[in-house]
Regions:
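Leucine-rich tandem repeat or coiled-coil scaffolds
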Residues: 1-105
Length: 105
């Protein structure tokens, strides 16, 4: 069985970002993204334009959630979809703590 080729997260983001008047949406649902990919994503400055981020149905764990919550570029994020990932109560706590600190997740 052949291994999947590595994901070029920057190319994927540039291909999938949908720019609108009020902000951008980024739909990365069901792309086999893991924690390493979310770590790369969380360091992309273009994320600061995103108001809606769909990361549902991937392979993201609490580690990826924490990387996303720690990103300096999520200040405009209003909607985050993480359905059907590998997130536990610990990941949910990271999200809740981000919300308490004034982030808009």
């Amino acid at each position: 069985m052949a291994e999947d080729s590595p994901i070029d997260i920057e190319k994927l983001v540039s291909d999938k970002i949908e720019k609108g008047v009020a902000g951008s949406s980024l739909i990365l649902e069901n792309r086999k993204l893991g924690d390493d990919n979310v770590l790369q994503l969380s360091n992309l400055e273009v994320l600061s334009e995103v108001i809606s981020l769909d990361l549902g149905e991937n392979n993201i764990s609490d580690i990826g959630v924490r990387a996303l919550c720690d990103s300096p570029y999520i200040e405009n994020l209003q909607t985050l979809n993480l359905k059907s990932n590998n997130i536990t109560e610990e990941g949910a706590k990271f999200l809740a703590e981000s919300a308490k600190q004034g982030q808009t997740i």
